[in-house]
UniProtKB/Swiss-Prot annotation:
This is Cell division protein FtsB. The keyword Protease does not apply. It comes from the Bacteria. The gene is ftsB. Part of a complex composed of FtsB, FtsL and FtsQ.
């Protein structure tokens, strides 16, 4: 009576091993799901960044306002009749 119970227990353990620890087991599925979620978050951040860059490129191609704004803020350029006043920010 004891041998069939032991054989049955061993059989259950042998059948459960691939389910939990095998190549397509639950632990592997959980790990891949976690990696997939992290990749989706990265993709979302990059899509937002790309949209911002695309808008900036479109703005630079379409008119002179964006070019003028960049020249003013990044290079400190002014028009001939303007006076440039710089107010430093407190750290």
């Amino acid at each position: 009576m004891r041998w069939p119970l032991i054989v049955l227990a061993v059989l259950v353990i042998v059948l459960q091993y691939p389910l939990w620890l095998g190549k397509g087991g639950w632990l592997r599925v959980w790990d891949v799901d976690r990696q997939l979620q992290a990749q989706r978050e990265t993709n979302q951040r990059l899509e937002q960044r790309n949209a911002g860059l695309e808008a900036e490129v479109r703005d630079l191609k379409s008119g002179n306002e964006a070019v003028e704004e960049r020249a003013r803020f990044e290079l400190g350029l002014t028009k001939p009749d303007e006076i440039f006043v710089h107010t430093p920010r407190k750290p």
